[in-house]
Design a protein with these regions (language model features):
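A structural signal for long, well-ordered, hydrophobic/aromatic- and basic-residue-enriched core segments
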Residues: 2-211
């Protein structure tokens, strides 16, 4: 899950309450919380019951990739999530984290260890939003059309529509949850055609973008 920042909000004044150092590691983190994350919208993953989708290709796709943990919704504490992003900082190849006086780091490798996912057979470095190739062939393979990006109007089959919704909410949860953007189209195509996806690097990349 990740927040959508609300930047450009009114700056806190000198009359603002003193920093609560049980919640924030510094005054700067407190300011970041009030300026960006306090009113941020938290994007929540959807709980997906694979046993209800056994008549589709979806369970096999997630089981063969060992991604089933990404479909299990856990308890959500909105205040902790917002504090996490306010206190976190990107330090090269890791994220320095601080939550309620507990310090830790997040790396691509720590995400992989937590999710118990095998790494790809070879490094995959291209981020989906940086992919410049034409997506026309991908769209046609998926059953869509280039002129339609709204999930309400794309002429997907029921199976593909379900897979796309799972992908958008649980694997690529950025701001607009009703649009199949070009990066999401590439991700969905790679998922559907069984291409290797470095999901741990992808999650790490999305986390860094949200900080």
């Amino acid at each position: 899950m990740s927040p959508t920042k609300h930047s450009g909000l009114k700056r806190p004044t000198s009359k603002r309450a003193c920093t609560d150092f049980d919640k924030f590691r510094s005054i700067e983190a407190d300011l970041e919380y009030n300026n960006c994350f306090k009113r941020a919208t938290i994007i929540i993953e959807k709980a997906v019951k694979l046993d209800t989708l056994e008549d589709t290709c979806i369970p096999a796709m997630f089981r063969e990739r060992m991604w089933t943990k990404l479909l299990n919704l856990v308890g959500v504490v909105f205040s902790i999530i917002k504090e996490f992003f306010s206190n976190a900082s990107v330090e090269g190849d890791y994220i320095d984290c601080w939550v309620r006086n507990k310090e830790f780091v997040i790396t691509r490798e720590s995400i992989q260890e937590f999710l118990e996912i095998h790494p790809p057979s070879q490094p995959i470095t291209v981020q989906y939003e940086d992919h410049l190739d034409s997506i026309e062939e991908m769209v046609l393979t998926l059953g869509g059309t280039l002129k339609k990006t709204s999930m309400n109007t794309i002429p997907f089959s029921l199976e593909m529509r379900t897979l796309a919704h799972v992908m958008i909410h649980n694997l690529y949860p950025v701001t607009n949850l009703t649009t199949l953007s070009a990066p999401r189209t590439i991700f969905l195509y790679n998922l559907f055609t069984h291409k290797e996806i470095d999901i741990c690097e992808h999650i790490f990349h999305l986390l860094k973008k949200s900080i």
